[in-house]
Amino acid sequence: MPRMSFSQNLYDLLDMKVMNKVIDSCAFLDFCAVDSPNQVSDGDAIGRFRNILIENGLQEKCDKDTHSVKKGNQRIDIMPDCIIIGGGAAGLMAAVTAADCGKSVIIFEKNQRVGKKLLITGKGRCNVTNNCTREEFFENIPTNSRFLYSAYSGYDCEDVMSFFECLDVPLKTERGNRVFPVSDRAEDIVIAFERAIKYRSELITVKNAKVTKILTEDNAVTGVVADGIAYHAPSVLIACGGRSYPKTGSDGDGFRFAKELGHKVTPLRPSLVPLVSEEDWCRDAMGLSLKNVTLTLKDNESGKVLYSELGEMLFTHFGISGPLVLSASGHIPKMQRDRYSVHIDLKPALDEKTLDTRLQRDFADNSNRDFINSLGKLLPAKLIPVIVKLSGIDGGKKVNQISRKERITLMQLLKDLTVTVKDFRPIDEAIVTGGGVCISEINPKTMESKLIKGLYFAGEVIDADAYTGGFNLQIAFSTGHAAGMAM
């Protein structure tokens, strides 16, 4: 059956009267205007488009799995080269890349708008990548970094930055080489992708559409079923995310699809997620954000330090959160209650001897004050009652009555405030999902399945995740680009 592109021959096929009906119904695609958004409003739109064709004698019948138009004695297939499941970071990058390679593409997106998870990343600012060296990038990927060598080589942080700047999104680099839009608006990143879709006539988005099955024949992809209708294509990309933030559409469908097609999925776990503490005192400091502290994660069973970094963290009603905690959580391979502990150095710029000297000076300046009222220059107000309680020193005790032993205990507490890790917070609160489709079954150069011809994976569905700082979005963009080039 001859294939035509979405817009290539429809002017010849349809007269303007029929074209106007298509456009007015918002069906399938705004074929006629380069300045009109080529996005379908919902999964029923293709059906409405086909009904218009039937009404105008352009299609003999409307079988659920038939998507072609008839001109004279010739039936012309209007199905795409590629179907992409999921309009997130990886899916969008793959779609734009494939379209630029001359492929016709349909994105099936569950939500009313693409990029829903992008809108909330980086606290609504969208940390699009990390402007670091190649070596630094892979140092920040604790899970299966070698698998990403080829994809990152083909599309690195500089490529991502150039992509958005070419779409009129100026970027800036902040502390830790984190790259954000100058506007600090994640919305601008999503708008940039929408703009990229808009001006690529071979790329359309079907929104509010739920894919329920991937079709195969003889170990090769033939299409998908979405909202009860079969759509055919020789290439299908699973880019529907993990299981974190399910309200954005990432509810684990990609893992189910992979398993149904014979792929192994490694155990899923929350990654980059807040931690629940055994200690109740964290609740007393709830809402307190600490800057310039050193957080160290230890494995109490082996005695090994798994992670140590200077930065920011936050106390919550359940335990601890913030950038340092999220990154530390990625170093916990499997949660075991009380096996891991977090050690907070509240004064990393001072060694123990220097800090003790500082305490002696502060105590001398406040010799007649109650202990609890002497720490204002040393600690945030919300943390003082916690430290006093943990030190074992009576808060009403006069400073000039505090013994050397008590002072040393206080000093050691300030250098090693310990939180015992009870558990991860639920996976739907995680920034990313750890685990995923087994990398041994994916071609690292193309992201194509080694089991099913024409099946591809990109983004969070793959068993590869990184620390905070823009690294996970870079993985999504790199793997999405690799898939888009190969589809």
Regions found by a protein language model. Name each.
Residues R125-T173:
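Glycine-rich active-site loop/strand segments that organize a redox cofactor
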Residues K207-A209, P385-D465:
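A glycine-rich dinucleotide-binding beta-alpha-beta segment and adjacent secondary-structure elements
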Residues Q112-V114, L119-I120, R134-E135, K264-R269, ...:
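An anion/pyrophosphate-binding glycine-rich loop and adjacent beta-alpha core
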Residues I78-A90:
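Beta1/beta-strand and adjacent pyrophosphate-binding region of the FAD-binding site
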Residues I83, A99-K123:
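Glycine-rich FAD pyrophosphate-binding loop
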Residues K207-A220:
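A conserved short coil-to-beta-strand element within the FAD-binding core of flavoproteins
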Residues D35-D77:
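Active-site- or DNA-interface-adjacent structural scaffold in DNA-acting proteins
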Residues I83-I85, F108, V211, V224, ...:
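Short hydrophobic core segments
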